[in-house]
From Swiss-Prot:
Gene name, Swiss-Prot/TrEMBL: ileS
An MF annotation (GO) of this entry: aminoacyl-tRNA deacylase activity
Species of the source: Serratia proteamaculans (strain 568)
GO biological-process terms attached to the record: isoleucyl-tRNA aminoacylation
Reported function: Catalyzes the attachment of isoleucine to tRNA(Ile). As IleRS can inadvertently accommodate and process structurally similar amino acids such as valine, to avoid such errors it has two additional distinct tRNA(Ile)-dependent editing activities. One activity is designated as 'pretransfer' editing and involves the hydrolysis of activated Val-AMP. The other activity is designated 'posttransfer' editing and involves deacylation of mischarged Val-tRNA(Ile).
Listed name of the protein: Isoleucine--tRNA ligase
UniProt: ATP binding residues: K605
EC number: 6.1.1.5
Swiss-Prot/TrEMBL catalytic activity: tRNA(Ile) + L-isoleucine + ATP = L-isoleucyl-tRNA(Ile) + AMP + diphosphate
Residue ranges annotated as motif 'HIGH' region: 58-68
Main location: cytoplasm
Amino acid sequence: MSDYKNTLNLPETGFPMRGDLAKREPGMLQRWYEQDLYGMIRTAKKGKKSFILHDGPPYANGSIHIGHSVNKILKDIIIKSKGMSGFDSPYIPGWDCHGLPIELKVEQLYGKPGEKLTAAEFRIKCREYAAEQVEGQKKDFIRLGVLGDWDRPYLTMDFKTEANIIRALGKIISNGHLLKGAKPVHWCTDCRSSLAEAEVEYYDKTSPSIDVAFHAVDAAAVATKFGVTRFNGPVSLVIWTTTPWTLPANRAISLHPEFAYQLVQVEGQCLILAAELVESVMKRAGITHWEVLGSCKGADLELMRFEHPFMGFDVPAIMGEHVTLDAGTGAVHTAGGHGPDDFVISQKYGLEIANPVGPNGCYLTGTHPLLDGKFVFKANDLIVDLLREKDALLHVEKLVHSYPCCWRHKTPIIFRATPQWFISMDQKGLRKQSLEEIKGVQWIPEWGQARIETMVANRPDWCISRQRTWGVPMSLFVHKDTEQLHPRSVELMEEVAKRVEQDGIQAWWDLDAADILGADAADYVKVPDTLDVWFDSGSTHSSVVDVRPEFNGHGADMYLEGSDQHRGWFMSSLMISTAMKGKAPYKEVLTHGFTVDGQGRKMSKSIGNTISPQDVMNKLGGDILRLWVASTDYTGEIAVSDEILKRSADSYRRIRNTARFLLANLNGFEPSTDCVAPEEMVVLDRWAVGRALAAQQDIEKAYANYDFHEVVQRLMQFCSVEMGSFYLDIIKDRQYTAKSDSVARRSCQTALFHIAEALVRWMAPIMSFTADEIWAFLPGKRAQYVFTEEWYDGLFGLAEGEGMNDSFWAELLKVRGEVNKVLEQARADKRLGGSLEAAVTLYADSELAERLNSLQDELRFVLLTSGARVAPLADAPADAQAAELVKGLKIAFSTAEGEKCPRCWHYTTDIGLVAEHADLCGRCVVNVAGDGEKRKFA
C-alpha cells in the first residue's frame, strides 16, 4: 500500500494551540510600546468622526483591584470598538491626585505639616507620593491591554490642570453660583475637615435612643391650647433623639402644623405627644396608665416656650414640614448647627445657629461645665445622666441604626456648622437647569436617570471648601471686616492661575497678596481653604477635555464608571459643567455594578474572597480577564471566582481553536491570486461567508449598544455551532483531499480567509492580545496592527432568491443534527465505529426530499457519511427513527458497502479500478492524478 500523506493538504500553522498568555502578553505589550501602536492608531483614524470617552480619574493611592480592572477594560473595549466602527477615539487616562488619603499616607511617613516638615515641604512629599502611585497603577492598567496615551496622562496635580481648576471656579463665581455661609456640613473629626456627600458611607452604629421632656415655661398657657384647665404636675413637650450630644445646641422644638397633638396625663406630669404616637411612646416608656386630657393642632402651639433641660434658657416651639410620624414623638429637637433641616427651619425663625463643637469633635470651652473638652460621642452617657438628674429623661434604650461614616476612616461623622463656601443649588437656578440637562443625556442602564434626578432634586448646596494642606487653593480674597469677596475676584483668580500654571499650587501659598492686590492688600486676606477633590475631578471636562488638542474641542461623548458615581463624579461633573457652561458635560453615561464573589458576596479581605487582577494575569493572562469582563452583564453585580474565570478560559480555548483551524487551513493561500470569485464558489462556502456577515451585523450592533456579553455569546455561537459543529467539520474532507490548487479547495480557503479577516476584528476589542497574534499569521498584505483597521467589508451572503438560501442551510443543519443523534446512539450501542462507516437513508416527505435531493451526490459530504440517499417517507421501515426537530423525516442507516479508502477514509465500491493507484477510490484518483474533483454544493 502506498503512503499518500504527501498528496493531502494537511493543516499547518505556526500559530500555537496553547495561548500561554501569561508568558506571551508582556512581550506583545513591549512591542506595542516600542512601535508606538497608540500613535499608529491615532494616525490611521485622523480626520474620522470623533468619539470621546473621558476617563474618570481613579485615586492615586494603592494597587488596582478587580473593580478597577472591570472599569478600565470596559472603557478599552468601547474605545477599540469605536475605532473599528470608523471613529477617531483617543483615550487619555487620568488620575485624581489631591486630597486626604494621600495626606494621611504622607503624615504616616513624615508627620503632619508644621511638625517635621513645613506645609510647602509636605506638599512636595504629597506630589512625590502621588506620582509614585500613578506609576504603579499605570503598569497594571497597561498590563490589562488597555491602549491609551500612557506617556501623557492627565493628572489633577499637573500645574496646568491645577490652574484650570482655579479658572473653573472663577467661571462659576462669575455666573453667580458661589455663596458663603455657616451651614451644617458632614464633618469628620479624624480628618478635621468637611466631607462631600460622595465621601460618606453608612454603617450600623449603636446609639442611645432617648425621649426627653422639655417643661413648659407657662404650663397653664400651654394647657389652654388643648382646652384643658385642670391637670396635675408640669406640662412637658417630649422629643426623641439618637444624638444626645447635639442637645447643647438645641434652640427650638419643631412640630408639624397639621398634626394632631394630645396632652396626656401620666403620674405626676402631663406630656405633649403626637396623637398617633401616644401608644408607642407609652409602651417603650413602660407607662401602663394614662389619660388624654385634650387635643390641638401643632400650629396652635407655635412659639410656646419650653425650658431647655440643662442649658439654663428656654426655646420656642416652631413649625416644620420635615416632622414625620414614622418614629419618635412627633416633636423634633432642633439644633440648627447640627442638621440641614434644622438649619433651614432655624433660619426661617431667625434662631441662633449654635455650634459648640470644635474641629476635633470636642465641646468648646464655655459649652457646659460637665461637657467642656469632652468628645461628643463619649459625652452621650454624660448627657443621659444629666437629663436623669434634671428629671427630664422619660426613656433611654440602645438602638442599632445606619449612621453616616467617613469613607476613609470608617468612623462616625457629625453635622457641624462651620463657615464654608458652597455652590448654591438654587441661588441662580442650578438645580432646575441640571434637572433639565439630565433629560438630554442617554443613561445606560436607563434607571440611572431616575437615580441621579432624585439625588439632584434633594441634594443640599455643595460645600466645596476644605481645610486641608494638599489641594487646589480656592484662590479667593475676602475683606477683613465684611468677609465679602474682592470685587475683582475673577480677574484676580486668573492672575493666580497663571502663576499656578508655572509653579503649581505652592504659588498660591508663596504669593504676597500685595503682588496682585496692590493697595487693597491692607484690607483683604487670602482664604486658606482648598477645594473639595470632587471639584478637581468634576471640572476635568473643562480643565482637561476642553484643552487637550487631541479632543479638538469636541467635548465628552461618554462617562463610564461604577454605579456609586451617580452621587460622585457624574454628579460633581454635572454640577460644575452646568454652573460653568449651562450644559451637561456628557452625552451618554454608562454605569457598571460592583464585583462580588461567586456567591454574590461583596469582596472583602476579612472574608478572604478577593481576587487580584495581577494574580489572574500572571496565571491565566490578560485576555482571560478581558473575556470575563465582556461576558458579564455589567449592569448588575459582576460575579468573579476561580470557577467563573475557568469557564472564561474554556470559552477562550474554543475561540482560539477556531482561529487556529482557520489559519492552519489557509496554509499556502495567497489572497491576491488564490481568492475565488463569489459566483464561482461552492454554495456551502458562500453560505459560511454569509453566516459571518450575519454574525458581524449582530456583533457590530451589540458593540454599538455596549452589549458586550451579547458580542461574546454571538461569537461563541458562530465559532461553536455554525462553524465548529457544522461548516468546519464538513469542509475537512474537501480541504484535505481535493487537489491543492483546485476551485473546490480554493473556494473553501477563500471562505476561511474572509471569515478569519472578520473574526479577528470581532475579537480585537475584547481579546486584544490574541487578535494581534492571529493578525500576524493571516496571509496577504496588511497593516501592521488590526487595531488600525475597521470592521471587515469583504463579506457577502447568499441571494435570498437562490434555492439553497440561508433557510435551506438552516434546515440542513437540523437534518444533520438528527442524523448525528442516530449515529451517536449506534456508536454507543457498539453497532458503528466512525460516521464514515455508515450509509444513511433519509425518508422524507416530498417537499423535504426535493430539497435534500438538490445536493445530489454531495449530500453525503454534508452528513459526513460514506453514503446518503433520499427515499419517500412512506417507504420508511419500522426501525427508522423519526426526527425530533425536523418534520416529515425518518432516518435509517446501514454499514457502508465497499472498502475503506486509505487516503480519504470513505467506504466505496470503486477502489482499485485504476491500476496505477490500485488502493485508491475513484475520487482520490481524480484528486491525485487527474484534474481534481468538482464540487458545486458542499
